[in-house]
A protein has these predicted regions:
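Conserved N-terminal entry element of GNAT/NAT acetyltransferase domains
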Residues: 1-18
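Helix-loop element at the rim of GNAT/NAT acetyltransferase active sites that forms part
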Residues: 25-39
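Conserved beta-hairpin
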Residues: 40-66
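Short acidic/glycine-enriched loop/turn segments that link adjacent beta-strands
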Residues: 47-49, 72-74, 138-142
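Conserved beta-strand in the GNAT
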Residues: 54, 61-70, 75-82
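Conserved acetyl-CoA pyrophosphate-binding loop and the N-cap/start of the following alpha-helix
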Residues: 87, 91-99
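Conserved GNAT acetyl-CoA-binding A-motif
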Residues: 97, 104-117
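Conserved catalytic-core motifs of GNAT/GCN5-like acyltransferases
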Residues: 113-115, 125, 130-147
Length: 150
């Protein structure tokens, strides 16, 4: 199923295996090239079991992505949220986040947690997340843990 952003018309859906190269390319552009995250930290073993969601622009190019990692006890974490610089603020990230929430609910998840970059805190607060704890550094970038009940 595809989730469409309320105001933007941006849509998001669960990624297929064939989408993986485009997801990796986007995450590399955003995290490694723009933000200076070491390449060896960008991909990890959790990618193999995660539910990946993506959004495409009008040309069909993957422009936003995120992943859902299921945990025990009806919880999950969301991570690797990335949007191409050309579409930031246009609803693609919100569409991806909404579809990740929908996928979590379908899997019986009641609460999601994420490690938000401090610069994106407002984005997550608008989506119903609350900060928990102090800021900390992850991969050289200031983060804060945020939680939302679904």
């Amino acid at each position: 199923m595809t989730r469409v952003g309320r105001r933007s018309g941006a849509a998001a859906s669960v990624a297929a295996a064939a989408d993986w190269p485009e997801i990796v390319a986007l995450r590399t552009r955003v995290f490694v090239e723009e933000q200076g995250v070491p390449p060896e930290l960008e991909q990890d073993a959790a990618d193999a079991t995660a539910v990946h969601v993506l959004s495409r622009d009008t040309t069909g190019r993957v422009v936003a992505t995120g992943r859902l990692l299921l945990r025990d006890g009806g919880t999950a974490s969301i991570g690797r949220m990335a949007a191409d610089a050309s579409v930031r603020g246009r609803g693609h990230g919100a569409a991806v986040l909404g579809e990740l929430h929908r996928q979590a609910v379908l899997r019986g998840v009641a609460e999601v947690e994420l490690h938000a970059q401090v610069t994106a805190r407002g984005f997550y607060e608008r989506a119903g997340y609350e900060a928990h704890g102090d800021e900390y550094e992850e991969a050289g970038i200031a983060h804060v843990t945020m939680v939302r009940r679904l």
